[in-house]
Structure formats: C-alpha cells, structure tokens
Amino acid sequence: MKAVVLTLAVLFLTGSQARHFWQQDEPQSSWDRVKDFATVYVEAIKDSGRDYVAQFEASALGKQLNLKLLDNWDTLASTLSKVREQLGPVTQEFWDNLEKETAALRQEMNKDLEEVKQKVQPYLDEFQRKWHEEVEIYRQKVAPLGEEFREGARQKVQELQDRLSPLAQELRDRARAHVEKQLAPYSDDLRQRLTARLEALKEGGGSLAEYHAKATEQLKALGEKAKPALEDLRQGLMPVLESLKVSILAAIDEASKKLNAQ
C-alpha cells in the first residue's frame, strides 16, 4: 500500500511538472499544487452535487414532492461562496505562515523525492506498459461476457457479476504485486531518508516541537478569526434548512391525504 501511495505521489508531481514544461510557465511549488488540487476538488464536488439535485428534481418523484431542492442548493452555494471569501485572507495567512516555517524541511524532502523519482521513473514506465497489457487482456476476457449479458435476461445480472469479480480481482492483484515488487525498495529508501531528516531535526534543538507549537498556535488563531464567518454560515443555513423542512412536511402531508382519500 505504501508503494502505491508513493507511485501516485510521483505520478502527480511528474505530471504537474510536464504541464508547465509544455506551456513554458514557471513551475508551481508542491505547496501551491496541493492548494490548487484542493480547490479543484471542492469545486468538482459542488458542481456534481448540483447536477444530482437537478436530476432528482427532474424525475417523476422530484416533481411530485416539489421540494425545490435546486433553489435551496443555489442558496447554500451562494452562502458558502460568501463564507469562503470571508475566510480567504485568514486561510491565506495561515498557509503562508505554515509554508514559511516548514520551508527548510520541504526543501530537503523535495530534494530526496526528486532523487527517488529519477530512480523510479523507468519502473513507472514499465508499469504503465504492463498495465496497458493487463487491461487489454482483461478487456478480451470480459468482451464475451458482455455480449452474453446483452443477449441474456435481467436475472443473469448477479451471475455476470459473480463471473466478473474474479477477473477484476485478478487484474488488481497483478497490478498491486507489480508495484510492490518494483517500488518497495524505493519506498523504504524514501522512508529512511525522512526518518533521518526528522532525527536530525530532533538533535538540532527541538525544531519539530517548534513546528508543532507554531502550527497549533496558528490553527488556534485561524479558529478565532473564522468564528464570525462560520456564524454567518450558520445564520445563512437556517432559512434553507427551515424551508426544506417545511417542503418535506408538506409533501408528506399531501401524500397522506392522497392515501386516505383512496
């Protein structure tokens, strides 16, 4: 599992650097990439959530209940955007302070990671090639089953799933075994380097304790500064939740009346 995590980390770093190479931009730091990734992830969740709400409202059940979830979702999204704007300067100050305090440690770790990445890259290329081969083999095995499913009846769904599961498990096991076999030594090397760095920090005068104390202090300050924005969020959510509650109760009451009338 550690080897898999290392693989994903190296792939993420390598892919990000390649993008800046082709675009001729200044490469982002790992810190900036983490923050950008978090922002993109949150936006994707928000957009996909709105799509699900819209699909539900367009369904027959959604039209019958008439909960107006989409309006409430937009109100909630607007409230969250305002809160994020209020917290922006506070969180930026926190990230800047934390980045400054850990700059030396991150610089050493980036150097170690770059060395490991250079050693691992040939194995990653080989893994990608083998992965494509395994996927093609899996596709060839699954193709007849897919055709059989299309020709069969619905009651064969469970049977098809039972037959597909061993093939999928076989593919996962092969990929995991290959990664662990090829990358485990490099994962151990990186872990040993990190342990050595941390031991050096301990021997150098309690830098780790200082990092922990400063991070705790900054988190406490962040919590105090965020209280007004979080209170605004709570006040903004109350009308949305109340409206949703009223809509649900009205829908239940309407359904009860229809059942009693029958």
From Swiss-Prot:
Record-given protein name: Apolipoprotein A-I
Keyword tags: Cholesterol metabolism, Glycoprotein, HDL, Lipid metabolism, Lipid transport, Lipoprotein, Oxidation, Palmitate, Phosphoprotein, Repeat, Secreted, Signal, Steroid metabolism, Sterol metabolism, Transport
GO cellular component: chylomicron; extracellular vesicle; high-density lipoprotein particle; low-density lipoprotein particle; very-low-density lipoprotein particle
Superkingdom of the source species: Eukaryota
Major localization class: secreted
Region annotated 10 X approximate tandem repeats, chain positions: 67-262
PANTHER family: APOLIPOPROTEIN, APOLIPOPROTEIN A-I
Subunit structure: Homodimer. Interacts with APOA1BP and CLU. Component of a sperm activating protein complex (SPAP), consisting of APOA1, an immunoglobulin heavy chain, an immunoglobulin light chain and albumin. Interacts with NDRG1. Interacts with SCGB3A2. Interacts with NAXE and YJEFN3.
Source organism: Pantholops hodgsonii
Sequence repeat intervals: 67-88, 89-110, 111-121, 122-142, 144-165, 166-184, 185-206, 207-227, 228-238, 239-262
One GO term (biological process): phospholipid efflux
Encoding gene per record: APOA1
Higher taxonomy: Eukaryota, Metazoa, Chordata, Craniata, Vertebrata
Family annotation (InterPro entries): ApoA_E (IPR000074), Apolipoprotein_A1/A4/E (IPR050163)
Record flagged with keyword Transcription: no
Localization in the cell: Secreted
Tissue expr: Major protein of plasma HDL, also found in chylomicrons.
Family to which this protein belongs: Belongs to the apolipoprotein A1/A4/E family.
Functional description taken from the UniProt entry: Participates in the reverse transport of cholesterol from tissues to the liver for excretion by promoting cholesterol efflux from tissues and by acting as a cofactor for the lecithin cholesterol acyltransferase (LCAT). As part of the SPAP complex, activates spermatozoa motility.
Signal peptide positions (record): 1-18
A Pfam family the protein falls into: Apolipoprotein
Single GO MF descriptor: phosphatidylcholine-sterol O-acyltransferase activator activity
Post-translational modification: Glycosylated. Palmitoylated.
